[in-house]
Amino acid sequence: LYVSPIKHVRVSGLGMQKTPSLQNAYDLKSPDDNVELYSAWAETYDNDFIEDMQYKLHFSVAEEFVLNGGKGLILDVGAGTGALAQALLQKGKFSIEATDISEEMLKVAESKKIYERSFLSDLTEEIPMENDIYDGVVSSGTFTHGHVGPSAMVELVRVTKPGGLVTISVNEKHWIALNFENEVEKFNKYVRNYTLKKISIYGEQSTHDHKDDKAIILTIKV
């Protein structure tokens, strides 16, 4: 696949320094905090987090997307280093575009040659795309804690074509604390239906403090 240069849509001024860690990721409060943490973490993220902490949520999101008929041109939201796209491509042929708030994470993702193109975006604002562009939208690990709340889901539906599919994960505690299901119900009349599934975020052999954390996989048929 041809990988285009990152499209610059946001420049942030960074604040306090963040040491890369899962707890600091859970403690993020603002877009700038997010940019700073993941800029520092990008080069070692795959080893430090995905492998060492037995993160497996991206596999579950990919499986649900495919089982529900996901296909075509896909937007990977909060793509990070590309783990979800890699999981999808193990299950079939997709054309995938990436967006993330972190330029450094997208650089790592681009190096894997799995995306058609990538661009920067902030989910607390509009995704810089017109309506009804993608056949599907996926996201793994972006709706965790911190600044990305349930209102951002409307943007994911907006850029998805009628008849398309949105499959995202939301940390279970975040889902409950911010009442994500209430937000889903608000726009439910504008979509065909949605389903919820609770799954483990980490592997059975993980031993860290968050090893028992769960996530809700939300699948919306637009």
Explain the meaning of each model-derived region.
Residues S151-P162:
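A short glycine-rich, Lys/Arg-flanked "PGG" loop and its adjoining helix->strand segment in the class I
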Residues H8-T44:
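N-terminal, positively charged/glycine-rich alpha-helical extensions of SAM-dependent methyltransferases
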Residues S139-T142:
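A short beta-strand submotif of the Rossmann-like class I SAM-dependent methyltransferase core
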Residues L75-E126:
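Class I SAM-dependent methyltransferase SAM/SAH-binding core
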Residues D46-A62:
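Conserved SAM-binding loop and adjacent beta-strand
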Residues T167-R192:
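Conserved class I S-adenosyl-L-methionine
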Residues R192-V222:
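Class I S-adenosyl-L-methionine
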Residues I127-V137:
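A short acidic, Gly/Pro-enriched loop at the edge of an enzyme's catalytic core
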